[in-house]
Amino acid sequence: MASVQQNGQRFGVSEPISMGGPTEFDVIKTRELEKHLQDVGLYESKEEAVRREEVLGILDQIVKTWIKTISRAKGLNDQLLHEANAKIFTFGSYRLGVHGPGADIDTLCVGPRHATREGDFFGELQRMLSEMPEVTELHPVPDAHVPLMGFKLNGVSIDLLYAQLPLWVIPEDLDLSQDSILQNADEQTVRSLNGCRVTDQILRLVPNIQNFRTTLRCMRFWAKRRGVYSNVSGFLGGINWALLVARICQLYPNALPNILVSRFFRVFYQWNWPNAIFLCSPDEGSLGLQVWDPRINPKDRLHIMPIITPAYPCMNSSYNVSESTLRIMKGEFQRGNEICEAMESNKADWDTLFEPFAFFEAYKNYLQIDISAANVDDLRKWKGWVESRLRQLTLKIERHFKMLHCHPHPHDFQDTSRPLHCSYFMGLQRKQGVPAAEGEQFDIRRTVEEFKHTVNAYTLWIPGMEISVGHIKRRSLPNFVFPGGVRPSHTSKGTWDSNRRSEHRNSSTSSAPAATTTTTEMSSESKAGSNSPVDGKKRKWGDSETLTDQPRNSKHIAVSVPVENCEGGSPNPSVGSICSSPMKDYCTNGKSEPISKDPPENVVAFSKDPPESLPIEKIATPQAHETEELEESFDFGNQVIEQISHKVAVLSATATIPPFEATSNGSPFPYEAVEELEVLPTRQPDAAHRPSVQQRKPIIKLSFTSLGKTNGK
């Protein structure tokens, strides 16, 4: 492998952690990894690769014909008509070289000043494409944050963006990496160009492109298997994973992919968020475009997992991440680190790392969001809108109830027996380490109604677009969420996660004080009434009720919520810094209290194991300490839909490794104390918004049951 030190070049904003080269063991493990990635079908065939190149050539000729047509229609002189040109660029996974079979190709059409987006791109070009027999499934999205047209050309999926440059002629050798190309460009053009500029810059900033590609393929596959690959759901998308992998490649420039994967988990499991990830020092530029800078922009201080793009204007590519999704990803990084350490002693293999996360076994309680529409086209539009808003439900629950965590599933589910309908699910559980009280109530009616009001404010809403939100127990999950539509007869056994859960249960049940508390809670609960679970028996009444638009008689609904550790502990100042951020770091200290009607009783405190730390070498010089407080309200548009008033604390720029919670079971979802959340009888709202039918709202009541009752259905 070529060393980056052969020419004295340094990559990134800090010195590498290690310049060590590969060992024979690394070569073997990397070959095993590459074979595994091939066996699971992550590489396209040579025939498909050739077909993609042919399709891109056809698309380039289409846009060149289009630009000649509109130039002639607008009466340009003969010279400009002769030189009229448009050009196709690629970006995303295809440009990075990590796309798989059947993946979309992200493309950008760059056109001259006289070819407008509204009238020409979404006008004449859209008309031309619609009349071509080789073009199918044409879906223009002119109102998107980054306007695009999606379609298939000869069976290959294309996402086509448009950038209108203030040039009369687009040269065939146009270089998009020059900042001057952004001068006098409109905002939508800047955003459209950003994909290509960022992708190309990533490839320039990694020491070895082939090692980067193999590692990124691995991490993308791992993230999808573990359910943390989705920008819209609050996790990380393709560009985010690419930036994180590129940073690891910079820190270990001579390492093979097996080491890069291992160090990925080791570094980011210990990373002290919200310290930002940079591939290069941010360029403030000379064009006056806004860049990510928490020293200047107060709202940038609210980003909890900033991963900054390397091309001007630098932006936070991960502003969608929430407290809950960050907690989930940190748990997954910890799990990955443990498995990679086990692999070094041959106690685990790549199959172990890529075990899919059993989402529908991880929780006892879920929120089910059902949507439907009148026809396929309406459902496609409605689905896209609802997916973009689901993150708001997670944020609202986090904001209103600081002790509850939401885990959104990144994909939708289709019930084949119900056409024009799909469902989304969120796991619910309570933070560990938060004092809890029997009988404590959480009125989530307002939260659900706020979310539904936001969704129903869709500007393209038409009758037939419906949404309902309800609670469902694990034992009542519909069969269509399981592979093949068949509910498994038992939970997963023999996996890394299940073994960790078993170990954790054994350690939990050995605690005498906890057992005493449990007995008291169970005896008090058994007096509550015939609807209470006794000895693990199911309630006689239904425990999965959907909050639809149809008025129904009130029912009690039980929701079990495991308690888990708070992630908000202060970092350990004695541990070596691994921060490489060239900026100071910020986070919010805003607080939100639960809506409670009854005073808390029998507060149970759960102790945590003493923290451990796993230090690694410093990779940057700590910066000066700075403290600042702000009190402002910000409107975040698409990032946070409602105004928030926060008291923001500016953290020390010296990054330290956060405490390691030894209570983890190898999964971000510890199985400890189990709570029962019961929905109390509710009244119908006085007024209903669109849709016109009124909807019930749930009140959730918490009461504790057995600590050892963690696998009950």
UniProtKB/Swiss-Prot annotation:
Residues that, per the record, bind ATP: F91, G92, S93, A103, D104, I105, D106, D159, Y229, G238, I239
Enzyme Commission (EC) number: 2.7.7.19
SUPFAM superfamilies: Nucleotidyltransferase (SSF81301), PAP/Archaeal CCA-adding enzyme, C-terminal domain (SSF55003), PAP/OAS1 substrate-binding domain (SSF81631)
GO molecular function: ATP binding; metal ion binding; poly(A) RNA polymerase activity; RNA binding
Primary location: nucleus
Site (Interaction with RNA): N320, R391, K396
Compartments it resides in: Nucleus
Cofactor binding mode and count: Binds 2 magnesium ions. Also active with manganese.
Low complexity: compositionally biased ranges: 507-526
Binding residues annotated for Mg(2+) 2, in chain numbering: D104, D106, D159
Effect of gene knockout: Lethal.
InterPro entries: NT_sf (IPR043519), NuclTrfase_I-like_C (IPR011068), PolA_pol_cen_dom (IPR007012), PolA_pol_NTPase (IPR048840), PolA_pol_RNA-bd_dom (IPR007010), PolyA_polymerase (IPR014492)
Any Pfam family: PAP_central
Biological-process GO terms, alphabetical: flower development; leaf development; mRNA processing; negative regulation of cell population proliferation; negative regulation of innate immune response; petal formation; RNA 3'-end processing
Function noted in UniProt: Essential protein. Polymerase that creates the 3'-poly(A) tail of mRNA's. Also required for the endoribonucleolytic cleavage reaction at some polyadenylation sites. May acquire specificity through interaction with a cleavage and polyadenylation specificity factor (CPSF) at its C-terminus.
Homology family: Belongs to the poly(A) polymerase family.
Record protein name field: Nuclear poly(A) polymerase 1
